[in-house]
């Protein structure tokens, strides 16, 4: 039960971080309070950091909200491609 509660809290914090309702530092402090400063806490903080700096919602090479493509169309007129969590204009995946 405790593991399920921890996972639920973590997913809630990820949702809050990706919506930018709170800043990354406050969410990482909550992770320290709930999970602690151990290996699992470090992993959780790394995931929150990766999602918080994800500006165009690219997840695993997929443009979830089409914001990468929209950004690239406005900026350079080229198609936007997600490379992991980064958006690159006019550079398709080579694999």
From Swiss-Prot:
Tissue specificity of this protein: Expressed by the venom gland.
Domain BetaSPN-type CS-alpha/beta: 55-95
GO biological process: defense response to bacterium; defense response to fungus; killing of cells of another organism
Transmembrane segments: none
Signal among keywords: yes
Highest taxon above the source species: Eukaryota
Keywords: Antibiotic, Antimicrobial, Disulfide bond, Fungicide, Secreted, Signal, Toxin
Its job: The short synthetic peptide (20-54) has antimicrobial activity against the yeasts F.culmorum (IC(50)=8.8 uM) and F.oxysporum (IC(50)=10 uM), and the Gram-negative bacteria E.coli.
Protein name: Opiscorpine-1
Organism: Opistophthalmus carinatus (African yellow leg scorpion)
Lineage: Eukaryota, Metazoa, Ecdysozoa, Arthropoda, Chelicerata
